[in-house]
Amino acid sequence: MSVHIGAEKGQIAETVLLPGDPLRAKYIADTYLENVECYNEVRGMYGFTGTYKGKRVSVQGTGMGVPSISIYVNELIRSYDVKNLIRVGSCGAIRKDVNVRDVILAMTSSTDSQINRVAFGSIDFAPCADFGLLKAAYDAASERNIPVTAGNVFTADQFYNDDSQIEKLAKHGVLAVEMETTALYTLAAKFGRKALSILTVSDHVITGEETTAEERQTTFNDMILLALDTAL
């Protein structure tokens, strides 16, 4: 066991899907996995292991924000030797050519978080996705005829934030805003693991269009299928 994950050694697969919402973790396990075992309920942050098309896969909720996902990614890697980490989360679009419910493959992540300033000082470390996972997800999207956009996202430290920088980010090609990817990619790089964020646009910062909480929990199925196919 680790501090925040109650699993025994061997209960967690080498590949783990990482939804922020623990109820999305339960939805994924109930809907897509077979032979499911719940290995974690600590703090209500559910974790499950099962099989998808014969491949052993785990799903672990992470909570919201850089500090929370950092706890779970650290423990999954250091205590359970997880090799592949695939975030399945929501994001807010900041460009007019990106629509609500679109799927984004995050190639890299800019941020206003201090996580990398603390680690690297004045150096601007640019964390990126694992190319093998990125390519696998892109190929899976092509096979399933699921449109995807690959590019830069922005990991914000605040959910309710000043929008003054949004226009500048959009002009520089940033597709959407979320709260975890920089931490995931930085920790994967630190420990020599593979990571990818697959995101569904849940709301649009510019137009104001948004999905409901229930939709965010249970209907982002294209993203989930791509993540599971990538796990194979």
UniProtKB/Swiss-Prot annotation:
Phosphate binds at residues 20, 24, 43, 87-90. One of its GO terms (cellular component) is cytosol. A purine D-ribonucleoside binds at residues 4, 178-180, 202-203. The active site is at residue 203. The keyword Transferase applies. Its EC number is 2.4.2.1. PROSITE patterns: PNP_UDP_1. It catalyses: a purine D-ribonucleoside + phosphate = a purine nucleobase + alpha-D-ribose 1-phosphate; a purine 2'-deoxy-D-ribonucleoside + phosphate = a purine nucleobase + 2-deoxy-alpha-D-ribose 1-phosphate. GO terms for molecular function: purine-nucleoside phosphorylase activity. GO terms for biological process: purine nucleoside catabolic process. Homohexamer; trimer of homodimers. PANTHER family: FI09636P-RELATED, URIDINE PHOSPHORYLASE. This is Purine nucleoside phosphorylase DeoD-type. The lineage of its organism: Bacteria, Bacillati, Bacillota, Bacilli, Bacillales.
